[in-house]
């Protein structure tokens, strides 16, 4: 018995060592890539640290107070909120529409699903942002077509060079990358039992009624998941605005996203990492508030099947 217990003890110790070995990369990654930088940024947010200066000192809440008096920061918040509030619902609506169409049992589903998912893979790339700038810029594809149709006066008109339309072009790019939420919607639609639709059809319910009375309530948890995911992602948008505006957020700060302004403060113009760190934590607070609102209101429109 004692020999068996001894062998079992050695075996358990070996298993524990193996478990620790496999867990080590994840723990080290969590510490090195997430927790330590997170803690460092919090500490830096209370300092006047600059990349161009070796020494720094603690200044308390001065960085946070300065944010309230920074007009460009408030402009970046305004631009980002417009982007999140307008582009995200439109993107989810397009994703849901395409998912519903693909769920009708059409042939070649795998092909169409792959085609519609491609924009999500490419949409945040530098190449697509450059292409977008060419399409909507002066003498680009869109101005050329609209000029020939007589909708605008000149081929030289630039949608990305006009403060009234520059943000809209980036919103269109965001909406175009609907593939990721579409795949999630499609997976949710395929989980809805067909017997509900059959029973509704027997009762005389049309397709539109079935959609609002069956599909939407049963799909509401998926809609909620996609909404939270896309809102968090939209708040952190950077690449498209950086490329299309040449890193300036123009014209007239009309595409000055919060992440873009944070980048210019910390890594390009002023190199004020202390202030940039404070801005990063403000962004965390804003995202938490919006996510909290989504969770708090979900009980009124998200339904879970018993």
Language-model segments: residues:
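Short, Lys/Arg-rich, polar N-terminal cytosolic tail immediately upstream
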Residues: 1-14
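A structural signal for multi-pass alpha-helical bundles of membrane permease subunits
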Residues: 15-306
């Amino acid at each position: 018995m004692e020999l068996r217990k001894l062998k079992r003890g050695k075996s358990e110790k070996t298993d524990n060592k193996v478990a620790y070995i496999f867990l080590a990369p994840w723990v080290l990654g969590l510490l090195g890539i997430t927790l330590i930088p997170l803690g460092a940024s919090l500490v830096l947010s209370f300092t006047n640290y600059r990349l161009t200066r070796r020494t720094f000192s603690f200044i308390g809440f001065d960085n946070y107070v300065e944010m309230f008096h920074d007009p460009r920061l408030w402009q970046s918040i305004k631009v980002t909120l417009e982007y999140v509030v307008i582009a995200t619902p439109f993107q989810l609506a397009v994703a849901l529409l395409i998912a519903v169409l693909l769920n009708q049992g059409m042939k070649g589903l795998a092909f169409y699903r792959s085609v519609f998912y491609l924009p999500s893979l490419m949409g945040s790339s530098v190449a697509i942002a450059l292409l977008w700038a060419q399409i909507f810029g002066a003498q680009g594809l869109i101005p050329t077509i609209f000029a020939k149709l007589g909708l605008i006066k000149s081929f030289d008109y630039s949608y990305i060079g006009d403060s009234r339309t520059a943000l809209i072009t980036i919103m269109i790019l965001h909406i175009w990358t609907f593939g990721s939420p579409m795949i999630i919607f499609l997976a949710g639609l395929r989980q809805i039992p067909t017997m509900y639709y059959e029973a509704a059809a027997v009762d005389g319910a049309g397709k539109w009624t079935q959609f609002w009375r069956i599909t939407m309530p049963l799909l509401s948890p998926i809609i909620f998941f996609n909404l939270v995911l896309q809102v968090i992602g939209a708040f952190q948008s950077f690449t498209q605005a950086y490329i299309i505006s040449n890193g300036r957020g123009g014209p007239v700060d009309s595409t000055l996203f919060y992440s873009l302004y944070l980048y210019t403060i910390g890594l390009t113009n002023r190199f004020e990492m202390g202030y940039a760190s404070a801005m990063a934590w403000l962004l965390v607070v804003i995202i938490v508030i919006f996510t909290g609102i989504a969770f708090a209101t979900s009980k009124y429109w998200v339904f879970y099947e018993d």
